[in-house]
């Protein structure tokens, strides 16, 4: 018998009628199922025993043969073979159809494969199949074409005229005949020739048709097989019929559908035998077509076949589709035996690798092990009595239970399992009660809390499974978060509070200033209460006297030997940093021991501190009232300005929001200072927030500051701020406003959780086959990673960005010019810091985006495995990890919105350009005009370039200068010397920079900082000027985009008319006139304002500042365009944004990008509601490029402006597809990674870039063929880029011309459906469509990914399941005994060793497993012996 693991691939094809008959064990002729009296299957019916096999094991239908010894005998009386009843799950039957019927998948799906082959539309096919029109099969000399449709009258006329030569048909027969006459080879050749002759054919249908023809040619399928003569009947056990109480039957819907087919087929046979009139026969044939269609795919039809209770029947297709379908319900998700679930409670006494297992559960879960053990120890004579003993819960059962459970790891899982840390292994410790005990530090990984959460427990049974659980899944091996390499096991809540208390310092506490010689003395002093835990004392530590506190001394005792003495107050963030540091320096074993000790100390001292919160602890800042009054005055002032018409209503609104945001921040500061002073810095509310144990600044602000601004349900901010806090109590109106946000939070949570889950599912689907498959793909390509800045603030340092990557080039020390880090060095945290110290701000590294591995990815491109901080191993399923890392925070974030209770966080708008250090203004670029106040104003977009002033000297004070103007200096380089009183001092550079020598002034300047400046910005500095830190370089209007007059003159309106496209409003409050440009659909107006010779195009929503004929001066604002009102930014905006990016959707108002470098020419042309601009290239060889921009959109460029390729020409969001087409793949990579990261960064979530890169790489795997050359591709065909390269190499070797293609970006869903594996695609979405396509192409699934292997029940090809590990032969003895004793004296040592083994390699593990296979019996005997020895002890 073949082993189920022995096949390498699965092919899907169309079945020919002969093949269907080969499968079949007999024809089903009757629609009957079972006899209602005898309850036995009817002969020749849908459950017939003769066809499908016997219902009782080893017994025929009539009972003549009743025993296994007649195996294989066919009964001469009833014709049933004596066999196992299991064959009823595999034997098929068939129905011979009286007339051919078209398969619904091939004619109804879009695009219709049948239609493409015959060059007919679905409606034309339908009219032939449903007997409305005839189709010409052989036109003879009639002048008509084959495949044309004619009606009945025409048909008879042609028959009379041309006799038997003219052939036309109707119904399935005709379609079958047409398909059979297609010569696939010849047709494909003709179309290819056509495409080459015409070169550019826009009709996509031709390419589609060629694709289908070639699919049939290459797969060996015949087109006429899409029309069925024989329908297969699936085995009866797969469409069962069960008796319910009360004598009724429940049956699968398929039986009803089959019965309809058989009934209609039999009726048709009778009608044909009786030579019934054509009209009746045709009607019956049409009904048969309907019935077979409904059987295969009922949901595809407009009028579905309904069963009892008007419910649509589930057809064969419906059984595969959707969440409840075969793929997702039964093949990808199965129920697990030996599992249980219970409520969890906290187990502070547990070690990190332990969980508390209730005895009741253990008894049930380990039943077979206990039974075997009872029999082995002769406490029970046989298995049956052992079982009875367990059920009676005898005393000796519990003794045995202890030994059975002892070294047997179990898996704990909490739903939803959003990332791999949602399932971890622990060693069980038996506990009383019914609740599972969980270690408090693993809660974060599971996202568990103890408010009624439940967890599931699973028992690994096989020795191999136990070994793998032990070496890979035990909790000490899962200390780090795979998303970012940070510890996920950090202490929270009570523990943090205890550690904060323990390590803090109090002034003037008892015993302050005392000296001690060591820890023992200090502990004695604490016991005798001569010194307090938080007093400042001096202690002799490692030969030095240090100032510290007893608490810190105690804390440092639990730190590993050799770790630096920690002498500061620790909050949650600091503690986490220490854990990360210890992990990197000492490994997981020591870290785990330390974690347990920190947990012990934390709980102990939180108990000693024993904080409680009362209403008096919530201190309101005394300055609050004054600050609120000031704010009210400022708001009034803004109202005043608005009434006078100085600012618009929108500007006023934004100003008010900004005033309240600032006031709220000031009140918060004051309140925190107040709390800090209270109770010597130990106000419980303050301590909880400051230590990071619970609560945040945001929440305490609402308790003791002011609640601040709230958001409407729409997300807009209500300008009426809530001035009260919860301590004072809210007014009625304030309370009412508050309720919006609170509800929105809860509603969002419910809706978004589902969205985040769906995002994760799509991410997993696209990246599940990315597995580390080789060590190095050898690519020369790489990416450049640099510091991430927002303005001038560094958000992500270089060391953080390049952590865990391989360098792609040699890194040289700029001073000594020696290679410090050669190419292909793995960058650890320490190395990253060194690279940063060398003065690099960007370096080239290897990246998943540029990996050339055909299947999966290589170690060098992927870099470090973030969960273990070692290079990723071959077999690591990095795609799935990437998907989980991106998807998991999505769900988290959506759940986190409601904690703030809807308080809006408005971002304060900057009004000035400034830099946070002294700097030199290098140059000011742009068109500047002088306004009425004498200030210089930018009339077009420009830039200000500044350099940081690092050092400044007067050369006269220096004795020697060794550098010249413009020279580059590295950090620490000597560039001058100065004679001091006695010796010569050498002067070195503080930072890398460039030398500027002007006269006697020597400056060292940082790199150019380019500040983009918008129109209307007022300049506050000059070229060559030194500007102090945080002083304004320029000032702008943050709320509006403006247009500035470049000359003085008279306003002339062109295509602007009040009442048509200009709305004239009078503001009711201020009586000012507002002129707003509105959209005008009917007339093609191109609104412009002309001043002198300059024209300014006016977009929709612009507010005109002057009327027609008004005089303007140079630098006046002609019109303003209000920028969109700020909505609050939270992941509610963020999750859809991530979704949009990964699905590569084109944004609604995408901006237009310049396709080449050149000058703008604007002739004012209008074509089809669009303005036409031209870009004139520099070189005369290039042609000018035409750009169409919708009327009403704000254009960013004007006549004569110079643009670069990829520059934005109008307002709007970037379209990723445009970026790919114009700027290329690397710009797109950068755009997608940075945009996704921005959303997560806003929420404070850290995800390593490489995870996003893995997904983006999978989105860019396809190429669209633009010119097929001599390859087998078709134009417009989408092919895998590796396949594209392989085919091109083949053609070039044969001397042909290769194909040309452009990379194409596919969204998650599209890319998943286009994977090479049809199994993976079919189980994702659009199951029938995928299978239809795969069957026609005769696709073979090579089972390379994880998903397809799970579906067919193979081991997944990752980790220890990789093919290369399956055939390992081992020739040496078993290495020692694997029974480890964790509860012995050397417990901690053992645990350290166990955890040190954390980065156990998959290869090692597989060897162990293989060795175990070799000698499993021996191992069991050995284990038994060792158990006996235990008993002797």
Curated annotation (Swiss-Prot):
Location of the region described as Disordered in the Swiss-Prot/TrEMBL record: 1383-1433
TM spans (from-to)? none
Enumerate the residues binding Zn(2+) 1: 60, 62, 75, 78
Q: Where is the composition biased (Acidic residues)?
A: 1383-1393, 1411-1433
GO annotations under biological process? DNA-templated transcription
Residues annotated to bind Zn(2+) 2: 777, 851, 858, 861
Group of enzyme by EC: transferase
Question: What residues does Mg(2+) bind to?
Answer: 449, 451, 453
Per its UniProt record, the required cofactor names are: Mg(2+); Zn(2+)
- Give the record's cofactor note, including how many are bound: Binds 1 Mg(2+) ion per subunit. Binds 2 Zn(2+) ions per subunit.
Q: Which domain of life is it from?
A: Bacteria
UniProt-listed InterPro entries = DNA-dir_RpoC_beta_prime, DNA-dir_RpoC_beta_prime_bact, RNA_pol_asu, RNA_pol_N, RNA_pol_Rpb1_1, RNA_pol_Rpb1_3, RNA_pol_Rpb1_3_sf, RNA_pol_Rpb1_4
Write down any Gene Ontology CC term. Answer: DNA-directed RNA polymerase complex
**Keywords tagged on the record:** DNA-directed RNA polymerase, Magnesium, Metal-binding, Nucleotidyltransferase, Transcription, Transferase, Zinc
Which reaction is this enzyme known to catalyze? RNA(n) + a ribonucleoside 5'-triphosphate = RNA(n+1) + diphosphate
Q: Which Pfam families match?
A: RNA_pol_Rpb1_1, RNA_pol_Rpb1_2, RNA_pol_Rpb1_3, RNA_pol_Rpb1_4, RNA_pol_Rpb1_5
Q: Which HAMAP family match?
A: RNApol_bact_RpoC
Q: Which family does it belong to?
A: Belongs to the RNA polymerase beta' chain family.
Biological function: DNA-dependent RNA polymerase catalyzes the transcription of DNA into RNA using the four ribonucleoside triphosphates as substrates.
Complex and partners: The RNAP catalytic core consists of 2 alpha, 1 beta, 1 beta' and 1 omega subunit. When a sigma factor is associated with the core the holoenzyme is formed, which can initiate transcription.
Write down what this protein is called.
Answer: DNA-directed RNA polymerase subunit beta'
